[in-house]
Structure formats: C-alpha cells, structure tokens
From Swiss-Prot:
The keyword ATP-binding applies. The complex is composed of two ATP-binding proteins (PstB), two transmembrane proteins (PstC and PstA) and a solute-binding protein (PstS). Belongs to the ABC transporter superfamily. Phosphate importer (TC 3.A.1.7) family. This is Phosphate import ATP-binding protein PstB.
Amino acid sequence: MTVQSPDDSTRAPATSTAAPATADPKIKARGVKVFYGDKQALFDVDLDIPAKSVTAFIGPSGCGKSTFLRCINRMNDTIPSARVEGSILIDGADVNAKSVDPVVLRSRVGMVFQKPNPFPKTIFENVAYGPRIHGLATGKAELEAIVESSLKKAGLWNEVADRLHQPGTGLSGGQQQRLVIARAIAVSPEVILMDEPCSALDPIATAKIEELIDELRSQFCIVIVTHSMAQAARVSQRTAFFHLGKLVESGPTEEMFTNPRDSRTQDYITGRFG
C-alpha cells in the first residue's frame, strides 16, 4: 500500500471527517469525552467499529487513542481522577450502564497491553485462570481442552506443549505476548483490545503477532493502537486517526492511506508531524 501525496490545494479542510463504519457495528461510540480532573483528554468522539475485523487507531503520542481504547472496557475506571461522558454500546448495550459489572465486561472485552504481562504462574495456569474463575469449565478435561484450544489459536501450542507446567515468565518476549493473547482468548471474548502490542518486540516476534492478528480477525472484533503506520496498513481493515484528543477521520484503511479526506491525516501519514 502506498501513500498518495496530493497537492495541498486539493486537500479537504481541517474538519472532522470521521464516518460510521457499518449499519450494524459491534461497537458504537457517540459523544465520548474523557476528563482527568479538570483536563479534558478526549472530545466528542463518534465512531463505529465493525465485528470480525481489525480497526487500527493511529496518531501522535498523547492524541487520545489509548484513552479511547480504555473506554471500551472501562479501564479508565481504575484512574480515580478519570471521568467519561457519552455512550459506548457493544451490541446495543451501554458499557457504562450502572447494571454492568466491569469484571464481566472485561471478560467480554479482552485487553493486551504494550509490554507482555504474564501472571507469575505456569503457562497452563496463565491460560486456565480466566476460565476457572468465570466457571467456563465443568471439569479438568474441559479446562485442559480450553487451554489447548486457546494456545493453538494464539499460535503457541507447538512451542509449549511439552512445558505447560513451566513458568510463563520463562518464555521469550514474543512468546509471552502470544501467551497473553491466549489468556484473553480463553474466556471467549467478543472484542480484543491491543494497546501497541508489538512495541516491545523484535521484528520477527512482531511478524508472528501480526500473522496471529490476521488469523484471529475472522473470530473477533479487534481494535489495535499502533504508532506504526506500516503496521496499521498491514493488519487493519479500518483505521481511525486521532489528533489532540479528537477523532479527525476514520474509514477503510486503504482509502485512509491512499486518499485521506482531511489535511491533518495527510500531514500525519506523510510524516509532516507526529
């Protein structure tokens, strides 16, 4: 995928050109604002995210992309000064409704962080932990089947099948990140959020994670924050560009990278700022 560089006079004015993704999105955000104390970090975000696809969030550091990502599974609840306004619906249900248990929500919406964070447990127990506490397995055999299936989906089973009872922290960085993805998959989520999942990995491990993301998108709604526009172009079907706490533009990834509608998007993807 190449980046088109139209003359400045042909570019769209600097107004938001974000558009709904589908008529029936998996995730639907409207008027989302985030405050940390008196400081507003996110301004009136409207965004639709489709099911069974990869949506990439791009933008310079501090633009609000990770802040918005954390709204989807209410991770901002863990920050005492944070306040979220607006609505985020998953399959039509507001994640911020008082009746929603954040723990249950986070089993539906898994999260993979920037640095691999396996539990200080065995490889098996890392994956078994979620299904066990959520009562997803009725016995040992079913739990073992979930662990095996999750590790296979994460592309890790063949590498660890003979050492399941060794510490997860003994794996390489790329293997640890795939273990974390297996842990998320094990509780049968509907959405997987990834906050710069490859930033701490070498190119070979990054390529394996990207291959895994491509394989998983047929089963899950995946949202990835990345500073790498090349990665966004490789793994995503839709892209959303954030700048200064605002969603500037969203749309099909190929269109965003070859024919952006907003001048700020064009400037960012061509390296004029960021």
